[in-house]
């Protein structure tokens, strides 16, 4: 299934990208369908992180983000610098708005 999807993709948008998903992507682990699709994919990759601020600023997460950002045709968008998080805390780590997500996907698809 993941091979077929990867061959048809014009863009791969990871929304939301958790710390765990980003770690798997950065290190080439494929324990689930999403990360298997990522490894089989050759289309541009848009990564939209969303997690608790402490998780986002952790050195391991920042290192994984840097690894991914350095890869060809990869772009990390976000997270927001502040806002209400899913855990109920306020701070950095919030997913960017749907408008930003759509804009980034359309920009990637339109030369």
Could you say what each language-model-derived stretch is?
Residues 1-32, 36-46, 53-111:
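A cross-family phosphate/adenosyl-ligand binding-site feature
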């Amino acid at each position: 299934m993941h091979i077929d999807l990867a061959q048809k993709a014009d863009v791969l948008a990871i929304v939301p990208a958790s710390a765990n998903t980003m770690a798997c992507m950065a290190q080439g682990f494929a324990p689930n369908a999403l990360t298997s699709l990522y490894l089989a994919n050759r289309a541009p990759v848009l990564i939209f992180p969303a997690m608790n601020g402490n998780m986002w600023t952790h050195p391991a997460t920042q290192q994984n983000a840097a690894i991914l950002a350095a890869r060809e045709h990869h772009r990390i968008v976000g997270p927001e610098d502040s806002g209400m998080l899913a855990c109920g805390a306020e701070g950095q780590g919030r997913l960017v708005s749907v408008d930003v997500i759509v804009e980034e996907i359309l920009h990637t698809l339109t030369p």
